[in-house]
């Protein structure tokens, strides 16, 4: 409805342009009424204002003309509507109805501060009131003298009359000015303020002073009795300290040292009672003798007399009306005086020191209170600096604040009256310059069209009534209206409104961002200024403040260090176990070998059992990582030992051969060596001495179908007899599916530690008539299974000896033996300890291979190893 009404108003204005002066009368009245009613709802104009707009604009009134006159009717419109158009926000700004009472409130606050919180010039008034009260008191004292009674009475009557008027007016002003406080607003708030103790004192003094002034200096009984009320003016001295600062200071000192005061008063009271009672017992039966020697009544006739004497004596007053007469009483009085006087005088010292400390604290507090205002200004400036960030489009409250503060005086009612008095033409004041038909989207306001002025009925050139400043204000107001219009129409605006405007050289789109940038710059400058002022107030008050700051910083540092140490202790120290070790369940735990027999457990490395809960502290994790690193070091040492063995180039000879058809002599084997078996490079060494063969049951035999056999046993498995080169012929055995053999140990001997008694046999003893059948692939298998050199990095023996774990492998191998069923097996191995090694550094404790079954008690020899399926 609003959009259609504005378009109808625009059409009506277009008709007025086309028809000149007479065309305005030809416009339909219904369109004008609709346009006027719509604009009245939009801009908040009163019906009288709408009539004034109609008379001023005629039938060609459009939206922009109404906007011009909205400035003139701004005050009346704001009084009649609770809402106004937001300047920088897209929503209407709610403005409550306010009276023009800023000056009234300012005066009220000023009077309240002068009477209740006097500072500066207000102290002069309170000093004058104090002199008036003091003068009344002095004159009241002089009236008691007969020689000054008449003169002082007359002056006292005049001064009291003046004081009554002063105090009455002051009390009325106090009641009225109390309305500036929220809790004292309204008549109920005023009654609450009047019930304050000091206000009640003022009322009582005023009521008591009025009868005294009324009766005057008459000599009747009533006037004489009422004159005694003049001394009630002493109570007016209490009103000098209306805020009670003195009493608050004394009360705070007493409360701060209440325990010391109670202790001193308690001990002093006990001393008073005890000394008075003892003196009464001694002096009660001693009569007083006058100068003539006559006996008088006793001085300490009652215990009350003794208490009076004790209080006057211990308070160091000493009237002398009562004194002990006997030496016993004097001795008691002297003893208790030395004790009691110190405790009676102690509260005075406590209060004096407490008051001094409180006064010093108040001075320091006043110095700190000076930081309150700069701190509040800094907080406010920091928030406005943050809220005016152009990227934060959701913060609109600060922009609304500037909308209420930054105001532009648009076309006021006085300006309209001045324009109407000059009898300027309608088109000269409000008609837009751009034609209706042009639908350009330009954002620049152009000056008023002179041609349109020439087309007016008067045909006389009129001066344009808008200067640059007014153009800027009009453009600013147009931008605010555009914001409001876009929010109301939900993004659908009047396309013709973009082409309308007053003469201005500034782009309309850049007007509001420019203003925001200026406000942003001002906020940055104010933030830096308030920050500088606040830093200036942070200067220490005196040397004690500096010492306190350093002490507070030191305590804070110690607390932080203690907290950090506690956190470190919590990290590195394991927590208490939830369940004792002797109560933990051992059910379901798998069998584990002892650490002395397991090849994967070192005896000197402490490891927790599987049943125990692992330590979850940082130190426990460090220990776990250290153990893993040690295991990795052992494995690396083992690999380095293997590398050293295989990189040594040895000249070994083959001691046996593998015949499959018949028998052949060693001479025939030598004859075929050069032409048939020269390319065979097998490394098989015998490190053991000759001896009786082991019984078959002492070997750990594994079936060949479960374990992959060696390359040269895969085709023709044979039995190699134990012995040297003269041990006889080799007898071939037929292959069997149940052939078993004993796998070699995974640990290889260190060749540099071989026994000097080892004998290497000739290579021809191992060669047979079918040795040429060995393929290169089988030859590689023989090389792998016969401990031939590996392609690893070369490490010398010195580096091996410097191994961090001292792990080395020093062992020999026995000769080949034959099993009962044709399988081959390794003989007993002899171990040798290298320099720097222990008995735990030998091959049973290497990190590869499984536990030998001999440790389980199965009757198998310790020299035999179980097959290892885990690669190194």
Curated annotation (Swiss-Prot):
Comp. bias regions, Polar residues: 587-600, 843-872
Outcome recorded upon mutating residue 310 to V: In BFNS2; about 50% reduction of wild-type heteromeric current; ratio of 1:1; or 20%; ratio of 1:1:2
Side of membrane Cytoplasmic, spans: 1-120, 176-193, 245-256, 354-872
Alphabetical keyword list: Cell membrane, Disease variant, Epilepsy, Ion channel, Ion transport, Membrane, Phosphoprotein, Potassium, Potassium channel, Potassium transport, Transmembrane, Transmembrane helix, Transport, Ubl conjugation, Voltage-gated channel
GO MF term (any one): calmodulin binding
S-S bridge residues: none
Signal peptide annotation: none
Stretches of the chain found on the membrane's Extracellular side: 144-153, 214-225, 283-302, 316-326
A Gene Ontology biological process term: nerve development
UniProt-listed InterPro entries: Ankyrin-G_BS (IPR020969), Ion_trans_dom (IPR005821), K_chnl_volt-dep_KCNQ (IPR003937), K_chnl_volt-dep_KCNQ3 (IPR003948), K_chnl_volt-dep_KCNQ_C (IPR013821)
Tissue localization of expression: Predominantly expressed in brain.
Modes of activity regulation: Phosphatidylinositol-4,5-bisphosphate (PIP2) potentiates the activation of KCNQ channels by enhancing the electro-mechanical coupling of the voltage-sensing domain (VSD) and the pore-forming domain (PD). In the closed state of the channel, PIP2 is anchored at the S2-S3 loop; upon channel activation, PIP2 interacts with the S4-S5 linker and is involved in channel gating. Calcium suppresses KCNQ2-KCNQ3 channel currents, with calcium-bound calmodulin inducing a change in channel configuration which leads to the reduction of channel affinity for PIP2 and subsequent current suppression.
Membrane topology: Multi-pass membrane protein
Biased composition (Gly residues): 11-25
Region (Mediates interaction with calmodulin): 356-537
Residue numbers bearing the Phosphothreonine modification: 81, 246
Extent of motif Selectivity filter: 316-321
Superkingdom to which the source organism belongs: Eukaryota
Intramembrane residue ranges: 303-315
Homology family: Belongs to the potassium channel family. KQT (TC 1.A.1.15) subfamily. Kv7.3/KCNQ3 sub-subfamily.
The protein's role, per its UniProt record: Pore-forming subunit of the voltage-gated potassium (Kv) M-channel which is responsible for the M-current, a key controller of neuronal excitability. M-channel is composed of pore-forming subunits KCNQ2 and KCNQ3 assembled as heterotetramers. The native M-current has a slowly activating and deactivating potassium conductance which plays a critical role in determining the subthreshold electrical excitability of neurons as well as the responsiveness to synaptic inputs.
Complexes and interactors: Heterotetramer with KCNQ2; forms heterotetrameric native M-channel responsible for the M-current. Interacts with calmodulin; the interaction is calcium-independent, constitutive and participates in the proper assembly of a functional M-channel. Heteromultimer with KCNQ5. May associate with KCNE2. Interacts with IQCJ-SCHIP1. Interacts (via the pore module) with SLC5A3/SMIT1; forms a coregulatory complex that alters ion selectivity, voltage dependence and gating kinetics of the channel.
PANTHER family xref list: POTASSIUM VOLTAGE-GATED CHANNEL SUBFAMILY KQT MEMBER 3, POTASSIUM VOLTAGE-GATED CHANNEL SUBFAMILY KQT MEMBER 4
Name the record gives this protein: Potassium voltage-gated channel subfamily KQT member 3
The organism of origin for this protein: Homo sapiens
